[in-house]
Every structure is written in C-alpha cells, then in structure tokens.
Amino acid sequence: MIREKQFYKTFFVLALSLALQNLLIYSVNMMDTVMLGRYSQNAMSGVSLCNQVQFMLQMLVEGAGEGAVVLGAQYWGKNKLEPIPHIIGAALRFGGGMAVLMILIVRLAPGQLLGILSNEPLVIAEGVRYFQIISFSYIVFTVTHILVASLRSVGIVKLGYIISFSTLCINISLNYLLIYGNFGFPELGVRGAAIATLVSRCVELLIVLYYLKFRERQLRLTLKKLVFIDTSYIRDYMRVSLPVLLNQAQWGAAQMVQTGILGHLGGDVTAANAIAVQSYQVLSVVAYGASSAAGIVVGKTIGAGKQSELKKLVHTLEVLFSVIGVFTGLTIFLLRGPILKVFGGSLTESAYLLSMQFMAVIAVTTVGTSYQVACDNGIIRGGGDTAFSAKMNLISMWLIIVPLSALAAFRWNLAPVVVFFLLKWDQLYKIIPVSIRLHSWKWVRVVTRGDREECAQP
C-alpha cells in the first residue's frame, strides 16, 4: 500500500472532481426521470427508452473520448503536449460521424426503434415525441464530451463539473416551466423535457468554447488546430481507440437488448428499471470517478517511465475500489425508500415493489462493479491494453447474459426480479477474469510514439 498522504490527496481530489462531474451529468437525466415520473408514468417510461437508445451514442462517444484520454495521459506524462491537439481532432471526426448516423436513425424510424424495446403503445408514443426534439442535441453533446474528456487527460477536470452544474440548473428550471406549464408557460410534457435538455446541451458547448478561447493555456486549442491535423495521428488514435469503440458499441447494444427484454415484461417493469438504473447512475458516481482517475494516474505513471512504482500503485487502487464498492452498495440499499418517495404518487403499487427489488439487486452487484470495472476500464485500459475489455464483454454479454436472461423471461417465465438479476450478475463473476488479467501485468504498454514496445513486467 502507498503510505504517502499526498498520493491520496491528489487521487481523491481527481476522483471526486470526476465523480462530481458524473453526478451532475447523470442528474440531468435523473431529473427528467423524476420530474416526468411525477407527471406521468408513461411519459417517464417513454423517455427512459429514449435514454437507452441515447446510451448507445453515449457509449460510442465515451469510447472516442477514452482513446484520446489514454494517448493524451501518456503524452502528458512524457511532458510532450504537441501531439494532443491532433489526437483530439481525430476523436472529434469519429465522434461526429457516429452522432450524425444516430440522428439519421432516430429521425427516420423512431417508432420502429422504440418498438424493439417495448410493446406498450402509449409508452412508445411518448418516446417518439421526445426523440423529435432531443435528436438535435446529439452532435452538440458529442463535441462537448470529447473536448472535456481530452482536457481531462492533461489534468483539467474542474471545467467538467462547472459545465455540468450550470446545465443542471438550467435543465431543472426549464423542466419545471415546460413539463408542467408553470408561470404561464405551455404544458408540454415530454416535449418540454426534451427542449430543456437541448437548451442545456447547447449551453454546455458554449461554456467549453469560451474556456478554450479565453482560459485554456496548456494545449492552446484552436479551430484550426482541430481541423488541420497531421493525419498520421489518426492511425495512432485508431490503434488505441478501435478496441474501446468496439467494446462500447457492443456494450451499448447489449444494454438496449436488456432494456428490450425488460420492456416486453410490461409497463411497470419498464418504469421500475428506469428508476433503478437512473438511481444507480447517480449513486455510483464515486466508483466511476475513481475508475477514471485511476486511468489518468496509471497512464501518466507509464508515460513517465515509472513502471517500478506500478505494483504498489495497483494494489492500493484495488483496496480503494473494494471499499468504495461496499460503501456504494450499502448507500443504494439504504436509500431505496427515500428515492422512491421522490417520484410521488404516479407509480403503481407493482412498479413501486419492483423498483425496491431491482435496487436491492443493484446494491449487491455494485460491489463487483466498483472493483472490476475500475480495474478494467481504469487500470488495464489506462495502462495501454484497450482490447481485453472488448473480448471479455463480448463473450460475457452475448454468450451468457443475453441468452440466459431471454430464456428466463420468455421461456421459463421467471419473476421480473430474477430476470433483472440475471441481466446484472456479470458484474460479479467478471471479477475473476479481470483480477487474473490485472495480476498478469500483460496490460502494461507504452502507446506513445517512439516507445511502442510492451513494457517489461513491473
């Protein structure tokens, strides 16, 4: 274990900064769920289906951003910042292309897309109304997310939560006015929630552009630097990012399939899943913040050539991830009742009971998530091995989780809570392959130019 207090101070400042940013980001969707939940269960369920489709885009955009973070953190560790704008430019190209594709799919076939996830006509109708407006935010979200992630790779983390806090306030205010029709505004329901989120995303981008123009001093990013890049860096970027993108794509698709399985079990199950997932995202931000911080710390350590320090660093991080997981799981379990009270009286009795059961399941699986996701996406990916996660999740999700859960739901007709557990239990058993890979040290790689050979075992 590392004993220097400065390490823990630095790590937790970074982790909590990223956690706060994630909290504010997820709170935007959470407030949509809460405020629409008090308006109408069908509206809440419809928007939750749209959010699941958007989760696919979010996963792809995060994959595009993670490639820039892995490369950027190692270049930062080498005190070599010149290549980073070229890498960011490459990430924006790929992220923008994926956003345009998602817009076309959502605009051309919204009903058919949501029909895959639910067989409830009223829920689908609410989702289509939401899609008609929110799809315009996809490119804005993509550009903002990649820029903020890229700045994070060089230690600039405060911008993210400043942006997210500002847009959360705007989103809540506009939701209050436009969903319910307060203070003379029209009562727009799901369309009001979509308008509020679209405006919030536009404000996010404006804040980022202002920061880059007037405050950022390390990379000195300009539109010219991001457009006219050395295209040879695209190869570097794709070499690192392609496995991450493939992993994120299949993970996002798997989450849509999971939502579809639950969505075809009834409206109450759809509503309970929406509440459980949104609550988990908000309450697990410290675990994911620690994961992101670990990726930056490990990447910088390898980039600086300090492989001899990795064993102690990794052991310390493993302990921290485990403690955070237990704490997060207990928090989710204890706050189930208070969270559901926030949704008021719009939930049916069945949806309420299912929500309590689903959140109890998540409280258990979160302990595994905190350890194995942080070790995988934080340490292993931050160390330069971006392919392991893609292979593991491909096998786990498509050969075990999805087939078994589909059989449980539609062939064996098991209770919804059992199906929900079978959809989430991979978070527990993946501890084994992740731990084996972590302690093999085969993930330690330098991915920057001039040092691409695999590093010796620490």
Residues covered by each model-derived region:
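Small-residue hotspots at the loop-to-helix junctions and early N-terminal turns
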Residues: 41-52, 127, 131, 267-282, ...
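Small-residue-rich hydrophobic transmembrane alpha-helices
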Residues: 44-104, 141-160, 259, 272-336, ...
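Helix-terminus/linker motif at the lipid-water interface of multi-pass membrane proteins
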Residues: 23, 27-45, 114-121, 177-188, ...
